[in-house]
A protein has these predicted regions:
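Mature N-terminal, pre-catalytic/accessory segment of carbohydrate-active enzymes
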Residues: 1-45, 53, 271, 364, ...
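Alpha-helical scaffolding within the catalytic cores
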Residues: 3-9, 41-46, 79-86, 140, ...
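Substrate-binding cleft and catalytic face of glycoside hydrolase catalytic domains
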Residues: 50-249, 279, 289-298, 306-307, ...
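Glycoside hydrolase catalytic-domain groove-lining segments
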Residues: 245-251, 404-454
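Aromatic/acidic polysaccharide-binding cleft in carbohydrate-active enzymes
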Residues: 447-559, 566
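Carbohydrate-binding surface patches
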Residues: 553-603, 634-638
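C-terminal beta-strand-rich structural cap/linker in extracellular carbohydrate-active enzymes
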Residues: 615-643
Length: 643
């Protein structure tokens, strides 16, 4: 059956598309405690690959490299700072702009109470002085890179990373009397950076980007907090998430509810509540288990009323599992053993009575089911009422997104997102609802992660990972955002890092190499993965000032989009996210007549290669109002007359 696709090219949905970009840290050439340092050839190879992949903006981590520890002063002439500047110059030589992460960890960065290297300007217990010193550091960085060294491709400052997932840095910072929340700490920092750059006459040199938060934990509070104050000085709004699992269709037991799934132990779902002392309440929700053999499961689901502590590495959550359980009272929780969870939807109810202490109360569920088999515990329809009352005390109990629910980690997803394209579109929609009208938006991190090969997402080194990335990129373009940034472009050696991530995953740290990219770390192996070619092909949509994007309408898991450069040249991108070949007929609202080059990424024939893979010779096709084609399974195709 033919798939009828259409490009709606009457009106663009984005008029200043900056392209598909990536996180690519400026580590090449930086010192390492084990001597794992790139040589010149490796530095050039990695930079050449970045250009070959069509990268236009590289977002990089940035350390306090300008500080000379031996001299205890900011010399801006240390070996590591010079190595970083050399990396920025290599990017400039290849036409790649830099989005500099000026700071990584909210609050903890400034007060030197996080895993990052201590900030030389920290004044213990003095937030305002430490913040003033930090803003000097940021402004002086702009001066040293752009004004002194002429590295004018440094165009963006990203203010922190995941400021809503700061661990316990806020609790141990010693400045809680001056910083009232995670949002407040980020806002004070970002606004102070803006003001310092204005004061020093450097604000026009860079754009400020943030808050770079996740769609989990305190979302959308960060956006709303900014809007309530002054949203104008932030130039680009950002957010991100990752796709690591897709669920089959699960019908909800109650109309209007959305179903979430926990697939790992240790998942908490909670909501702050204002409870009265010495009062009886009823907490209820629906639950079901999906597993082949429940007999082998261990663990449990614990639900009810808890007290949150502010000392957890994951933020403000209640404790259970391997820690002491922080119940609100002795009899405020109930437990269901894993094997006894129902196969079909069943409403669980927990009646509890509060005692005198009801401060820091939350109601929630701790999913701690364990076993060698893959499983899902589904939950929905949450409710809390005072006994004998019909007044609902929970907000968003139907789980229409994460609003009002705190500490929903990545492994907790909406089951209505049954395909990857919808997942990415919904992720953008959630963020755009909360940013000021007319502001630019970047999806500042994303990737598709297969946990031990879960059966519906490809591993990073498998050819279909290229298809997965292409689906995300088409979804981002059709959502009208200004840019997307893949985490990460390459597998990279983090200096002085020797860590390992979970061995069952093909991503994460392997002896300090952060494995997330489309090419191996050159020090370990001169190799590009098959997905490298898919990323290069999708970057044929171009990007830059004045580049327009037109929305595509697909069907049956075949997706399309179109970009057009200021000179009128265009690229149509089509992805067949099916396991079988699919015939297509693509039409345009406004007739397109042109000779286009057809570039194909076929997972069935794509392989990894050393060096920089040669670009395949395209097939030329004449387009006169429509494109007719047959796409192989998992194929990514670009029809283009862009250079």
């Amino acid at each position: 059956m033919q798939n009828n696709l259409k490009i709606e090219n009457n009106k663009p949905i984005q008029t200043n598309f900056l392209g598909h970009n990536a996180v690519y840290h400026g580590y090449a050439g930086v010192n390492d405690d084990a001597g794992r340092v790139f040589n010149r050839e490796q530095c050039e190879l990695e930079a050449d690959r970045a250009k070959d992949l069509g990268l236009k903006i590289a977002r990089t981590i940035y350390n306090f490299w300008g500080y000379d520890k031996a001299k205890q002063s900011w010399t801006w002439n240390t070996p590591d700072f010079n190595a970083f500047c050399a990396w920025v110059q290599r990017m400039k030589d290849r036409g790649i702009d830099i989005a500099l992460n000026t700071g990584w960890l909210n609050i903890g960065e400034i007060m030197s109470c996080s895993w990052r290297a201590p900030f030389p300007g920290t004044v213990k217990g003095n937030w305002q002085q430490s913040l003033q010193n930090f803003t000097w550091f940021v402004s002086e960085t702009v001066h040293q890179l752009i004004e002194v060294r002429g590295l004018t491709n440094v165009k963006y400052l990203v203010i922190m990373t995941e400021p809503n997932n700061i661990g316990n840095a806020y609790e141990v910072s010693g400045v809680k009397n001056e910083v009232h929340s995670m949002q407040d700490g980020w806002y004070q920092t970002a606004e102070a950076v803006h003001n310092r750059l204005v004061q020093d006459g450097r604000r026009s040199l860079v754009k400020l980007v943030g808050p770079n938060s996740t769609l989990t934990g305190c979302f959308p509070e960060f956006y709303d907090y900014i809007k309530e104050r002054n949203p104008d000085w932030l130039d680009v709004y950002t957010n991100h998430t990752y796709l690591d699992f897709l669920w089959p269709e699960v019908k909800t037991p109650v109309n209007g509810t959305h179903v979430f799934s926990a697939i790992y132990p240790g998942v908490r779902l909670q909501q702050d509540v204002a409870l009265k002392p010495n009062t009886e309440y009823e907490f209820s929700y629906y639950i079901k288990l999906n597993v082949e053999n429940p007999n082998v499961l261990s663990g449990y689901v614990l639900h009810g009323a808890f007290k949150t502590l502010n000392k957890d590495g994951n933020g403000r959550v209640f404790h259970s599992g391997g820690d002491d359980t922080t119940r609100l009272g002795r009899y405020t929780t109930e437990m269901v053993e894993a094997a006894r969870l129902p196969d079909d939807w069943q409403q669980l109810k927990c009646t509890f009575k509060t005692e005198e202490d009801v401060q820091d109360a939350v109601v929630g569920v701790f999913f701690d089911v364990k076993g060698s088999q893959k499983y899902s515990v589904y939950a929905t329809g949450f409710s809390l009422k005072e006994k004998g009352s019909n007044t609902e005390l929970l907000q968003n109990g139907n789980l229409n997104g994460f609003e009002h629910w705190f500490r929903c980690p990545y492994m907790l997803r909406q089951t209505e997102e049954q395909n990857a394209y919808d997942f990415w579109v919904h992720a953008v929609e959630k963020a755009l609802k909360h940013i000021p009208q007319g502001k630019d938006f970047w999806f500042d991190e994303y990737n598709i992660l297969s946990h031990g090969g879960n059966g519906n997402l490809a591993r990073l080194e498998e050819p279909c990972h290229g298809t997965d990335l292409a689906v995300a990129r088409v979804a981002f373009m059709n959502s009208g955002i200004q840019s997307s940034l893949l985490w990460t472009l390459f597998d990279q050696q983090w200096p002085n890092n020797h860590g390992y991530s979970d061995s069952k995953d093909d991503f994460g740290f392997k002896d300090g190499v952060h494995k997330f990219g489309v090419a191996a770390c050159p020090m370990r192996k001169n190799w590009t993965y098959p997905a490298y070619k898919a990323v290069r092909l999708t970057d044929r949509v171009g990007g830059g000032v004045g580049t327009k994007v037109y929305k595509g309408v697909g069907e049956n898991n075949v997706y399309c989009t179109m970009s057009q450069a200021p000179n009128g040249k265009l690229t149509v991108l089509v992805v067949n996210n099916n396991s079988t070949e699919q015939p297509i007929s693509l039409t345009f609202e406004n007739k397109v007549a042109a000779t286009l080059n057809r570039y194909l990424y076929n997972p069935a024939t794509a392989t990894g290669e050393p060096g920089i893979p040669a670009l395949e010779q395209p097939e030329k096709i004449a387009v006169n109002g429509s494109i007719t084609d047959v796409l192989p399974a998992g194929a990514v195709v670009a029809y283009t007359n862009m250079d």
